[in-house]
Structures are given as structure tokens and as C-alpha cells.
Regions:
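Acidic beta-strand-to-loop metal/phosphate-binding motif
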Residues: 7-9, 75-77, 106
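A structural signal for isolated positions on well-ordered beta-strands in alpha/beta enzyme cores
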Residues: 2-6, 40, 104
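N-terminal beta1-alpha1 ligand-phosphate binding loop
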Residues: 1-31
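S-adenosyl-L-methionine/SAH cofactor-binding core of RNA-modifying enzymes
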Residues: 35-103
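Short glycine-rich anion-binding loops that position phosphate/pyrophosphate groups of nucleotides
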Residues: 11, 78-81, 109-112
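Structured adenosyl-cofactor binding patch, chiefly the S-adenosyl-L-methionine
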Residues: 111, 115-159
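Short, acidic/small-residue loops that bind anionic groups at enzyme active sites
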Residues: 97-106, 126-134
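Short glycine-rich, acidic/polar surface loops and turns
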Residues: 91, 103-116
């Protein structure tokens, strides 16, 4: 199984990008012993369409076109489900045990996700009730993926 963060827009070099890369690298290393074959970042261009609905539809099309057969799609959405780190880890572990080949975590553009992506989602996930900048949402998600790996492996990073 592999994890892919599919994000609309590109993250510039700097402290935020360094922190994102650090958590992705930690997740890669921690996941190897758990059968995770990769933790990838897929940055897609923002739509240039004039209308928000057209931008969302175009961006959703890009995310959906990249899904392989059997993949699970997790969309980050402000109206999504709030989960504890332990529950998030259990969900990932269940999908791994079900031989899901890939989990794609989608972070939409400034206008959010298009209806097609929301309808296809296997899980709509919120990172709490607050709205986060997309760069911080990427970092939070990468950290939670790493944390899930440490929970599954019994590493002391996650303390209750």
C-alpha cells in the first residue's frame, strides 16, 4: 500500500516546505516496516477558470484522473468527519489489511472540492472546526500520517 497526498497548488520552498518534507520522510521510513511502499506528494496546478464551480470541477477532474483502480479517496473538507489520531490510524490500518493498494488524500484548491470528488470520496476528513491555510493543512496531514505509522508500530512518538 502507498499513500499519496494530492494537492492543488504548489508549495514554495521555505520553512513550511521543509517541515512537510520532514514529516513525509518520517512517514516513509516508519511505514516500511508496516508494508507501506511509498508516501508521495502530487502537486497539481490550480485551475485558471473564471467561475469557482468551473475551477472546482476542473481540479476535481485532475484528482480523480490520478486514482488507480481500488484506491481509497480521502478528501479534506471543512464539513468532513473529525477523527482522533488513534481512529485515523485504525482506519488506515483497516484499509491496509483489506489490501487497498493506495490511499489518496486530496487537498482541494482555494474554492474547495468539486462535487464529483466529494461524491467519490471514501472518507471526508476535517482537521478540526477551524479553517487552515492549505500549506498548514498539508503539514498537519503529513504529521498525522506519520503519527498513524508510529501508533501502528508501537513507537513512543504518540503518547496519550
Amino acid at each position: 500500500m502507498r499513500f499519496t497526498l494530492s494537492c492543488i497548488g504548489r508549495m514554495k520552498a521555505g520553512a513550511d516546505r521543509d517541515l512537510l518534507d520532514r514529516y513525509l520522510d518520517r512517514a516513509r521510513k516508519s511505514g516500511r516496516g508496516l508494508g507501506i511502499t511509498g508516501v508521495l506528494l502530487n502537486e497539481m496546478p490550480e485551475s485558471r477558470a473564471q467561475r469557482a464551480e468551473d475551477r472546482k470541477a476542473e481540479e476535481a477532474g485532475g484528482i480523480l484522473a490520478s486514482l488507480q483502480s481500488g484506491a481509497r479517496l480521502v478528501v479534506l473538507d471543512e464539513n468532513g468527519r473529525n477523527m482522533s489520531s488513534a481512529a485515523f490510524s485504525r482506519t488506515l490500518e483497516t484499509w491496509k489489511n483489506d489490501s487497498v493498494p493506495e490511499i489518496v488524500f486530496a487537498i482541494g484548491g482555494a474554492d474547495g472540492h468539486g462535487g464529483e470528488a466529494l461524491a467519490r470520496a471514501d472518507l471526508k476528513l476535517a482537521l478540526g472546526a477551524m479553517t487552515w491555510p492549505h500549506q498548514i493543512a498539508r503539514i498537519l496531514l503529513a504529521e498525522q500520517i506519520y503519527r498513524a505509522m508510529t501508533i501502528q508500530s508501537g513507537h513512543p512518538y504518540h503518547r496519550v
